[in-house]
Amino acid sequence: MFEVDASNVLDYFGDVGRSQWDLLGLSGGALSKSTATELAWGVSNIVIRVDTPVRSFVVKQSREQLRTKIDWFSQLDRIWREVDVLQILQTLLPVGAVPRVLSEDRDNYLFTMEAIDADHRVWKADLLDGVFDSSIAERLAGHLAAIHRGSTGNGEIAERMRDQTVFDELRLDPFYRYVAETCPQFATPLNSLIKRTTQRQDCLVLADFSPKNVLLTSNGPVIVDFETGHYGDPGFDIGFFLSHLLLKTVRHHERVSKAIAPAKRFWSVYRGELSVVPSPEWLAVGRRNPTFERQSIEHLAACMLARVDGKSRVDYLTESWQPDLVRDFCDDLLTGRHSHMIEAIVLLERLLECR
């Protein structure tokens, strides 16, 4: 495999990747006038922006070993799972909500896609800087609801996305299973959650729906990074996404009412979107007994624990008490006695108000 980076990706396009260059409709002369810049999109892939005199695009290539302090590996062909999800999302979301795939190099585990405006902002950076815009959370709630609703009961999507191997390698194992093994006090609820999660086949689940993968442009938010997509438990997306928002709230505890507002707005809009008749069967079951909502709360707790005790830990909870507060909060949620997500969100708000 030709491993690309910002220093050699143009050489790739001039040699083994020349067919990709041609598929992009670019001439040989444009190659010498092009530039390449590596983008900071997570730990599992190499992502490079290429600017040519004609157009800009992004190159993405998977890596077997992820860039984390603790050893973490995943299969290279997960990159094609991302291509599949991108193509499916083109049919479920408004134009421009996700990038369009432009070309694929199967031999080198690489594909190209549309580039986002160069002056975009990453929503994660805004949140870390203390900028809390609930309208972004509202837009994203609508998008996630459209994905979950639109893929429910779709046999073609279910068959295409049924395999959960990458989801296990990049989420269940390093997030849930690792914490269960290293923090025995959480082993029983986490192992139970793993079992129940793998048994669900409800809809398309992104499993990496987070602020770091939301790029803010003048035309609205654009969502990226889909290699963990699969047909499974929608509660994981809810818990994963809200875990990021609530961890940022812990960081900005001195402004808790403003910091927690996007989480409240997201849940309110998402729940409202899926309550429109006819609603997905898995949500209707949740009305009779709050299985979906309760399991979403468990995912919230498990994902927050994973970011303080798992293989991929946040680096922005810098006060010594913050990880312990997260653990105590999650321990409470994993008891199973909370049936409503807003109760869990408000519980954290009250804990932080007491600091």
Q: What are the roles of these predicted feature ranges?
A:
Residues A36-V59, N191-F236:
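Active-site acidic catalytic loop and adjacent metal/ATP-binding pocket
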Residues F292-A302:
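Alpha-helical scaffolds flanking conserved acidic
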Residues M1-S34:
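Juxta-kinase regulatory segment immediately upstream of eukaryotic protein kinase catalytic domains
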Residues L39, S44-G155:
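ATP-binding pocket architecture of kinase catalytic cores
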Residues T68-R78, L204, T217-R265, S320-D324:
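Active-site Asp-x-Gly
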Residues D84, G235-E281, V285, L300-T318:
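Active-site activation/catalytic loop segments of kinase-like enzymes and analogous catalytic loops
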Residues M1-D11, E114, I147-R196:
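Active-site catalytic-loop/activation-segment of kinase and kinase-like phosphoryl-transfer enzymes
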Residues E254-S257, C303-R355:
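ATP/Mg2+ or Mg2+-diphosphate-binding catalytic cores
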